[in-house]
Structure formats: C-alpha cells, structure tokens
Amino acid sequence: MKLKRVQLFFVILLVTATSSCSNESLYRNVAQVNYGTSFGMCVGYCKRDVSIDSVYTSYSCAGWSKEVEPTQSKVQTTKSAWDSVKVLINNKAFFELPATIGCPDCADGGAEWVEVKLLNGTAHKVVFEYYNEPQQLQSSIAKLRQIAGKNECK
C-alpha cells in the first residue's frame, strides 16, 4: 500500500514537471505577439494593430477609405515588456482556442484579435467580439489593450 502511494506521488510529480516544462518551452519559443481591433462600418481609423517582438513594438492605424492615411510607428521593446507579454500566453490553452469565437463585428460591434507566432513558424490567431474576450484570454487582453492604448492615431 505504501509503495502504491509513493508510485502515485511520483506519477503526479512527473506529470506536473512535464506540464511545467512544456509551458516554459512555449514561453521561450514565442517570436511575436500581435493584437488588433477593427470595425466594419466606421469612418476614420477603423483598424488598429500592435505587433510586439523582442526588438520592436509596432503600431499601425488604417481606415477603409483612401481618404484616411494609414499611420505607423514603432518603439523599442524593453526586455521587461517583452517578458510580460510572453508570460501572458504561457500555456497551451491559447493554441486550443478556435480561430473565431462568437460573431466578431456583427452589427458593427467590432472585432478584436490576438495572434501568437512561435520561433518554429507555427502561428495561431483568435478573433472574437470586441470587449467579449474568452475567459482564457482575459488577463492577456487587458495587458494588450494597455499596450495598444499607446497607439495614438491622429
């Protein structure tokens, strides 16, 4: 009986260690995180995107008409900022989410999206209704919205 408890303990320990390693390796393998919003029926800057990697954070704004001149800017990404973004997707739950959740931009409600690109070329993008993010993304989206808020489209 005691031997079975010890075996069970080691099995649980092994599973926990394996899960942590896979999450940690995913964290280390993130190459880029992209986030954006869009509104189909709008005037002015209807699309706002931010792209974050270990070197730069790039911002862009665009509209649907030619009268709206697209804007772009970029700043250097600090190590602490990059680490804080990468840690947000420090699990496999993001990659298990469907590509589309709900009805993004239906009735001009707007859409938000997050895309994670890994060093091996794998990428996954999730699009969802504006300010109706899935529970798995709530902390990630809060941080990404904060970063995107620095994008001043004029």
Where do the model's predicted regions map?
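Short, solvent-exposed loop/hinge segments that bridge or flank secondary-structure elements
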Residues: F39-I52
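Sec-dependent bacterial lipoprotein signal peptides
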Residues: M1-S19
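Short, well-ordered, aromatic-rich surface patches in folded extracellular/luminal domains
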Residues: R5, C21-G40, L88, F95-K154
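Mature extracytoplasmic domains of secretory-pathway proteins
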Residues: Q72-A99
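Hydrophobic residues embedded in beta-strands of well-ordered beta-sheets
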Residues: V55-S58, A123
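A short, structured loop/turn motif at beta-sheet edges
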Residues: I52, V75-S84, V116-T122
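Acidic/histidine-rich, surface-exposed loop or edge segments in extracytoplasmic proteins
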Residues: Y59-Q72
